[in-house]
């Protein structure tokens, strides 16, 4: 019997320097939700009214669904199209961190919320038409056999679809509410920014190997898919934020991030500046030093608690 050869990954022979660069960024950014003191937000949570609490739980449940998709379907689908073993390794890291993100929302729920309210939100997520629709749209492309279209769908999920949900904790944070929860969300946003950038980079590398007509076809596909997702996301936003008066602000944030998603793919912005004008308070809440709780690049800060090792001495054991 003839055995096929199996090659071990060799990080000392890199075919694409971007793989090592992004691997190092992702591993240096590694974090876990257990290190964020979410319990410090209990007093602020209790001051939210019932409608605000329900909205927050629903927002985070919707985000959990997207992270679940990216963990179990999105990143694994991209791994099958990897051009290098190092790209495959980076995508496996991305897949794992999406699981961490999904776990993080459960940490928020178990710390701040009543189980019955969380259970109700999960039921809501399975019955909400726009939420289920965007999941189905993305999953359909992940199941296809067209690698570059998979990457387009993945970039739109990473760099656009999350942001109708990310808006809310940034809004609360800008008003001094749920600041530790916002720190955790910033950790997630930092990861998603790297994910969207990297997958977009791999998409642009893939374009180098196809014809001009195929490139044009993919560009049209990308813009058409974005508009399909945007129309659905606008409906989702209108339903989710219906009673708040914040719908227009969230839609502006969507347009802003849709343009960023297109830029990750190497394309020009679609939405004009007047449609993508985000409230400065939200942009300030997104900034690396918002609330001075969080170091955006190192993952450390007063809200991310890391233990310090101290050498013991003989006297320490004299009880």
Annotate each PLM feature.
Residues 1-319:
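Non-heme di-metal
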């Amino acid at each position: 019997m003839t055995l096929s050869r199996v090659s071990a990954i060799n990080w000392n022979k890199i075919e694409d320097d971007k793989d090592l660069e992004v691997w190092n960024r992702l591993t240096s950014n590694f974090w876990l939700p257990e290190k964020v003191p979410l319990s410090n937000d209990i007093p602020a949570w209790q001051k939210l009214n019932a409608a605000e609490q329900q909205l927050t739980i629903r927002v985070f449940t919707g985000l959990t669904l997207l992270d679940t998709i990216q963990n179990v379907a999105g990143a694994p689908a991209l791994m099958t199209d990897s051009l290098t073993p190092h790209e495959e390794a980076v995508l496996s890291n991305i897949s794992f961190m999406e699981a961490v993100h999904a776990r993080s929302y459960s940490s928020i729920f178990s710390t701040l919320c009543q189980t019955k309210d969380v259970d109700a939100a999960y039921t809501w997520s399975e019955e909400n038409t726009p939420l289920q629709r965007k999941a189905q749209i993305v999953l359909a492309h992940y199941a296809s056999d067209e690698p570059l279209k998979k990457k387009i769908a993945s970039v739109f999920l990473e760099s656009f679809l999350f942001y109708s949900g990310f808006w809310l904790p940034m809004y609360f944070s800008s008003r001094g509410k749920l600041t530790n929860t916002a720190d955790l969300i910033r950790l997630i946003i930092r990861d998603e920014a790297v994910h969207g950038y990297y997958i977009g980079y791999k998409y642009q590398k893939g374009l180098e190997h196809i014809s001009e007509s195929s490139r044009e076809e993919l560009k049209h596909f990308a813009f058409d898919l974005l508009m399909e997702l945007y129309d659905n996301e606008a409906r989702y936003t209108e339903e989710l934020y219906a009673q708040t008066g914040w719908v227009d602000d969230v839609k502006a944030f969507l347009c802003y991030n849709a343009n960023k998603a297109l830029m990750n793919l190497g394309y020009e912005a679609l939405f004009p500046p007047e449609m993508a004008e985000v409230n400065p308070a939200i942009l300030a809440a997104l900034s690396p030093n918002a609330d001075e709780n969080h170091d955006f690049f190192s993952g450390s800060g007063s809200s991310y608690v890391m233990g310090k090792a101290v050498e013991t001495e003989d006297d320490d054991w004299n009880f």
